[in-house]
Amino acid sequence: MKILDRLIGSLRGCCHSLPDIRQGGDVRYTMADIGLSAFSLFFMQSPSFLAHQRRLDEGQGRSNCQTLFGLDRIPSDNHIRALLDPVNPDHFHPVFAEVVAELEGSGGLKGFRQPGGHVLIALDGTEYHVSKKVHCQRCSTRQRGKDTTEHFHAMLSATIVAPGHNRVVPLEPEFIVPQDGHEKQDCESRAVRRWLERHGRRHTRLKPV
């Protein structure tokens, strides 16, 4: 639990420093509350914000949210989205680095080491939103038939993996979004190049292959 407490503390500090678009001093939830509330949804493995809220209202998992995250109340999903959507995901990159550092220091990466001390880093594109109606400026698009446009969000996920290992270690993702100064749509291969340029050198100490 000490490692988990330190990592949650790191996440709390990261969320506390997130840019806040709200004006005025009457704030019911801090940005740390907002960020940790979103994270608790995934940590508690709830299928949706609504299901998460209902579970807490019914007392299920409330003690865990209070003990682990210090959350007495969970903001509504709309409130969380309104404050987190404008935040650049890069703000969370230090937390990924902290996870890797903790695992290195505690020997948690030993099970991922391959012959020669190498680790396997898998880069793979994935979509996490697809809609024919709901879209935004950061959406990519594709045609489905003559008259149908499909909008989607995609990202390049980076993970430390190992054969026969049922867990992975997530690294900083790279989002596949329209790039300033580029007329062509962004794609997975360009995201791979950006990820290597931004993060490759820092991860060389892991001896990746």
Predicted regions and their residues:
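Short, conserved catalytic/metal-binding motifs centered on acidic residues
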Residues: S37, H52, S76, I80, ...
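Short, flexible active-site-proximal loops enriched in glycine and acidic residues
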Residues: F49-A51, R62-P75, F92-F96, K110, ...
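Electropositive, glycine- and tryptophan-enriched low-complexity nucleic-acid-binding patches
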Residues: Q143-L206
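Structural motif corresponding to the C-terminal cap of alpha-helices
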Residues: P19, G107, H199-H203
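Charged/polar, low-hydrophobicity segments characteristic of intrinsically disordered regions
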Residues: C65-A82, E188-R194
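Gly/serine-rich nucleotide phosphate-binding loop at the start of the catalytic core
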Residues: M1-P75
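Generic alpha-helix structural propensity
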Residues: A32-L36, M44-P47, A51, P75-A82, ...
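Active-site-proximal, Lys/Arg-enriched surface segment
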Residues: R81-H165
